[in-house]
Amino acid sequence: MIEPKILKKGAGRVWVLGDLHFGVRANSMEWLDIQKQFFEEVFLPTLKKNVKPGDVLVQVGDTFDNRQSINIRVLNYAVKLFEELGKILPVHVICGNHDIWAKNSNEVTSIDSLKWIPNVQIYKEPELLNWSGKKVLMMPWRRDADHETETLSEYPTAEIVFCHSEVKGIYLNAKVKNQHGTDSNIYEKYARVFSG
């Protein structure tokens, strides 16, 4: 059995972000401006006003959009944003399928550019954490449903899962139900599952 890494006692709330896709639409500067506006006018002020001791932020994958390249302006903004977030609260970044260079490997990723930032932890491989007595699995993108099921079976004591997964049967929006991916029933045993 894998023992969890114990984090600071008295954990507070979890702020969840997902699928930021920095560099979307071929590194569009227009889209970057929209993202900047959201973070600078809405998210960061809200976070600064409401964050409490013990709170953490989890970015559940696809921080970046393009597997092959990132515009330098896009990368610089993302790094500055995560530096700012790390000054406010601990940040956990899970690797998503758009963050990896090779389809079946998490070895080379765009989120590696964030690993040097203080108070920012990246997850390229699964890791079990203990947050205030709760066993929390941080599970990055797995190459297919079988690999995902296998990974979950390696962490039988996990109670909460933060992951980047394609889950069959969930609603992608109010009208569109995902028709492919890992069957949602493998997540039924967990108290909470947060996926990008």
What are these regions (language model features)?
Residues 1, 29, 138-139:
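Detector for methionine-enriched segments
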Residues 14-16, 58, 138, 160-164, ...:
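Structural motif
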Residues 20, 63-64, 74, 139-141, ...:
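Long, contiguous hydrophobic alpha-helical segments, chiefly transmembrane helices and signal peptides
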Residues 78, 95, 99-187:
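Conserved catalytic scaffold of divalent metal-dependent phosphoesterases
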